[in-house]
């Protein structure tokens, strides 16, 4: 049968001081394991030598919580390699590799326990550790291994195959199957199968158990198997129960040892002494109970001394390493998951001490049995010292009665300590009703006693006869609620769960059974619910989920639902100093119960739910805000009109808040309006741009046609006038006055020499001339002071917020809608001196003079180019000066320039479709 194989560390590529690879030879709750040197070269290597040549069946690795190797390779060899000779490395045969989790999901607070099933024969095992996973805790790029466990059996190759074949042949003829035991009671336990691996050989067992107690458990397990073989089932049952109790004892002693080591490291020697004495008393009490029931004495054929200490198997040339090392960071803790080390211990240490300590056990005491006797025994069979004297002959086995079994169970688990004076005063009413023994159990420092007290109280309340006096029933209920309140605050999950079970029984069974009133149910809920809600914000995810599920379940009890108490607690506004978990749990509970209970006679109303949800929209935690949005949408489905009363109006200013934008878009979906996707929006913009360009071209063609007709009409009129003048002014010599020809503009060159923004036409407006006009003179354009691009004044605000190179330095004022530098924005908003902007359909808002004026595109031309318009348009001064200059000139040159000066107020309108974004926003860069 495969079992635990002892080993020694032959070599390693290096280690950090105090974290030698020899630490891997010890399995205990306080071990620290091996760590590579800081900033080491990869790969790192460790070579182990097993106590004998064996067939390895299973390898277990307990990884560090943050010093994690990305990959670990396994090699096996029959003999020790000599690294000085290169070809000797070929002696190792590669078995494969495993990849380790980077532990990001647990925040580097859990240790991964990796089990690898192999089938290889050898005596030397080599582990190669590759590059570490990077995380914020592993600042030195190290890899570490807390523990390694090897499970296998001796490799007797000459007989193994024959024995295996013979066993299979016998099973075949007897109709047995190793995977389908004949006795269903043996399924999953030891049944004589050759491939069975005992749970006591698992690495998780040793890493949580006190070493002495773990060795005693192994002895009792051997005796249990012998008793089963001899069909002494009563004795086997007794041993099975003792093993179960001892596992709890071992976990407790292991935790005491960790707390003692932590106290020593903090130089709190009083606490260390107290823990040492506590361990000694508890250990002596347990051993006394075991001796009382004959559990420390083996059968005559199984008797073995308990006189040798647990120590690693080391060769004479490799001295023992007993060096204390510092504890792990306080943030580290073991988490029980499918792939992580477990189980979770029910009793947690005090808050002042870390949950782990990495210290080595003390060196073995001198004066024990000779070393030669140790080497005869297999590594995992070495006995531990229990008493200084040698045990006598085994006593005869006696039948154990049920009452005796109960006494033993209580003795092994430990009796509750007496109540202190403070506890006596605090729980005086409960003691008078329930008795001091039960209350002492509920106040005990041992979690098992606290749990047993609650279970005993549960049983006591269930057995209360129906005809009991009402006063006694109410006193019993109030005393029970008092203990429940204390247990709800317990940090141990099993005690907390027992309190929930007891509270549920009181509300759903005890009160209805004895026909107590609603006042008693109200008393239970009011006293327990605030504490339950606080536990819903616990840092432990396991306790948090238990509390959330129970609150939801309790709110649906028919006895509690009619009281409408729980909804009134949940709609209370979130406190600013509340924990993140509590805020998330409260909004999550409200969302759950709102779906289950609705708003009709449930304690939830549209008013109180919406007030809570709107206030939750301002919470600092994203998950809280997201759940609040979901609550508002749920309320809108049922009460749309009442829901809208608690929200701001749906306008562009409100939609600038992303949460309200999501809310109103959700309303639209609920109402049946189909909102376009982002792809659809982009497609619509492209279509709109094309339509605008097409419309612009059509308008230009229409304008060109109109101007052509006007020129033809004007030419006809001028021709008639010229004929009349010709007749009137004809001189005797037959000469006629020749009028200068009127210049005509071809239709296909109408846009030549024209500014499409201000409408000015000038012969100097060539391609370069227009660039100069845009850059310096056009009244509709301006230069951005930050990126020096030329933009339309009407779109200056949008440019500063979305297109400018310095756009990250601007914010939008919700009052005037202008782009304000972010460092000035808080003061700008606070003073409220800006001119409020109106909706685009009502008025335009000028970013230069900050005034509102008539809406529309033409209004921009009037405002920016007219004499009574914008007073802050600096280009207007230059144009006015340019227009008045010809009037001040003298002579024909001045008159000629006056007649040829371009008109500022051109009547050519700006195209209604507007320009494409590429041409209307940014025109040139210096």
From Swiss-Prot:
Domain of life: Eukaryota
HEAT repeat start and end residues: 522-558, 603-639
A Gene Ontology cellular-component term: centriole
Protein's cellular compartments: Cell projection, Cilium; Cytoplasm, Cytoskeleton, Microtubule organizing center, Centrosome, Centriole; Cytoplasm, Cytoskeleton, Microtubule organizing center, Centrosome; Cytoplasm, Cytoskeleton, Spindle pole
SUPFAM superfamilies: ARM repeat, Galactose-binding domain-like
InterPro entries associated with the record: ARM-like, ARM-type_fold, CEP104-like, CEP104_N, CEP104_Znf, Galactose-bd-like_sf, TOG, Znf_RING/FYVE/PHD
Alphabetized UniProt keyword annotations: Cell projection, Coiled coil, Cytoplasm, Cytoskeleton, Repeat
Chain coiled-coil ranges: 212-279, 678-730
UniProt entry tagged with the keyword NADP: no
Ranges of Polar residues composition bias in the record: 916-926
Region entry Disordered, spans: 345-419, 690-741, 885-926
Bias-annotated ranges (Low complexity): 889-903
Compositional bias (Basic and acidic residues): 398-409, 690-701, 718-729
Purpose: Required for ciliogenesis and for structural integrity at the ciliary tip.
Quaternary structure, from the entry: Interacts with CCP110 and CEP97. Interacts with ARMC9, TOGARAM1, CCDC66 and CSPP1.
Designated name of the protein: Centrosomal protein of 104 kDa
Gene name for this UniProt entry: Cep104
């Amino acid at each position: 049968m495969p079992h635990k194989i002892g080993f020694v560390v032959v070599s390693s590529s290096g280690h950090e001081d105090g974290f030698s690879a020899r630490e891997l030879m010890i399995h205990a709750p306080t071990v620290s394991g091996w760590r590579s040197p800081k900033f080491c070269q990869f790969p790192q290597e460790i070579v182990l030598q097993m106590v004998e040549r064996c067939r390895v069946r299973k390898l277990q690795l307990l990884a560090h919580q943050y010093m994690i190797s990305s990959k670990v390779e396994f090699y096996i060899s029959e003999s020790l390699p000599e690294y000085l000779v290169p070809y000797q490395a070929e002696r190792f045969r590669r078995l494969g590799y495993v990849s380790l989790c980077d532990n990001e999901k647990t925040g580097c607070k859990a240790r991964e326990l990796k089990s690898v099933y192999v089938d290889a024969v050898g005596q030397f095992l080599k582990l190669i550790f590759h590059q570490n996973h990077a995380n914020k805790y592993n600042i030195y790029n190290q890899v570490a291994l807390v523990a390694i466990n090897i499970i296998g059996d001796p490799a007797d190759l000459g007989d193994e195959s024959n024995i295996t074949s013979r066993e299979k042949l016998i099973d075949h003829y007897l109709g047995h199957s190793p995977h389908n035991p004949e006795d269903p009671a043996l399924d999953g336990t030891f049944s004589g199968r050759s491939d069975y691996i005992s749970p006591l050989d698992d690495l998780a067992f040793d890493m949580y158990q006190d070493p002495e107690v773990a060795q005693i458990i192994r002895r009792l397990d051997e005796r249990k198997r012998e008793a089963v073989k001899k069909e002494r089932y009563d004795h086997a049952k007794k041993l099975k129960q003792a093993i179960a109790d001892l596992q709890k004892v071992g976990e407790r002693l292991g935790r005491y040892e960790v707390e003692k080591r932590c106290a020593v490291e903090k130089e709190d020697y009083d606490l260390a002494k107290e823990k040492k004495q506590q361990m000694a008393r508890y250990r002596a009490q347990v051993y006394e109970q075991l001796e009382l029931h004959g559990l420390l004495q083996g059968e005559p054929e199984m008797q073995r001394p308990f006189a040798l200490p647990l120590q690693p198997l080391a060769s004479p040339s490799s001295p023992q390493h007993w060096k204390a090392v510092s504890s792990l960071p306080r943030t580290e803790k073991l988490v029980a998951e499918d792939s992580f080390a477990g189980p979770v211990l029910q009793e947690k240490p005090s808050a002042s001490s870390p949950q782990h300590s990495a210290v080595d056990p003390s060196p073995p005491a001198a004066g024990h049995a000779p070393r030669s006797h140790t080497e005869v025994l297999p590594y995992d069979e070495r006995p531990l010292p229990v008493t200084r004297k040698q045990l006598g002959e085994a006593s005869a086995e006696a039948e154990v009665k049920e009452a005796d079994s109960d006494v033993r169970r209580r003795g092994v688990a430990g009796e509750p300590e007496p109540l202190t004076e403070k506890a006596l005063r605090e729980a005086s009413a409960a003691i008078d009703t329930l008795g001091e023994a039960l209350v002492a159990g509920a106040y005990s420092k041992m979690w098992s006693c606290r749990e047993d007290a609650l279970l005993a109280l549960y049983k006591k309340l269930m057995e209360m006869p129906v005809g009991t006096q009402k006063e006694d029933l109410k006193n019993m209920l109030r005393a029970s609620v008092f203990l429940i309140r204390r247990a709800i605050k317990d940090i141990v999950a099993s005690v907390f769960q027992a309190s929930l079970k007891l509270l549920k029984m009181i509300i759903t069974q005890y009160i209805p059974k004895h026909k107590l009133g609603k006042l008693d149910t109200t008393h239970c809920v009011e006293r327990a619910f605030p504490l339950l809600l606080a536990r819903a914000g616990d840092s432990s995810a396991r306790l948090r989920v238990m509390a959330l599920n129970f609150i939801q379940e309790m709110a649906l009890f028919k006895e509690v639902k009619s009281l409408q108490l729980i909804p009134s607690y949940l709609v209370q506004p979130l406190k600013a100093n509340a924990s993140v978990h509590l805020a998330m749990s409260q909004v999550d509970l409200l969302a759950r119960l709102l779906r289950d209970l609705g708003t009709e006679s449930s304690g939830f109303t549209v008013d109180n739910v919406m007030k809570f949800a709107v206030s939750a929209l301002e919470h600092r935690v994203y998950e809280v805000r997201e759940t609040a949005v979901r609550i508002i949408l749920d309320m809108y489905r049922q009460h749309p009109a009442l829901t809208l009363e608690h929200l701001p109006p749906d306008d562009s200013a409100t939609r600038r808040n992303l949460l309200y934008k999501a809310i109103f878009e959700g309303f639209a979906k609920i109402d049946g309006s189909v909102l376009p996707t982002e792809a659809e929006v982009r497609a619509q913009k492209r279509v709109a741009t094309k339509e605008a360009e097409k419309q612009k071209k059509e308008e230009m063609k229409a304008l060109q046609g109109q101007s052509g007709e006007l020129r033809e009409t004007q030419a006809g009129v001028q021709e008639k006038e010229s004929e009349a003048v010709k007749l009137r002014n004809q001189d005797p010599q037959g000469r006629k006055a020749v009028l200068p020809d009127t210049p005509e503009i071809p239709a296909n060159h109408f846009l030549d020499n024209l500014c499409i923004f201000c409408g000015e036409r000038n012969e100097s407006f060539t391609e370069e001339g227009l660039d100069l006009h845009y850059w310096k003179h056009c009244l509709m354009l301006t230069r951005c002071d930050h990126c020096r691009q030329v933009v339309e004044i009407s779109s200056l605000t949008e440019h500063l917020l979305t297109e400018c190179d310095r756009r990250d330095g601007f914010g939008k004022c919700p009052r005037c809608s202008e782009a304000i530098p972010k460092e000035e924005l808080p003061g700008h908003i606070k003073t409220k001196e800006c001119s409020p902007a109106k909706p685009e359909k009502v008025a335009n808002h000028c970013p230069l003079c900050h005034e509102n004026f008539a809406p529309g595109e033409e209004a921009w031309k009037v405002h920016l180019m007219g004499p009574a318009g914008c007073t802050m348009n600096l280009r207007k001064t230059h144009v006015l000066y340019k227009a008045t200059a010809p009037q001040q000139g003298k002579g024909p040159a001045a008159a000629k320039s006056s007649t040829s000066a371009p008109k500022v107020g051109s009547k050519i309108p700006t195209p209604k479709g507007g320009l494409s974004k590429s041409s209307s926003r940014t025109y040139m860069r210096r």
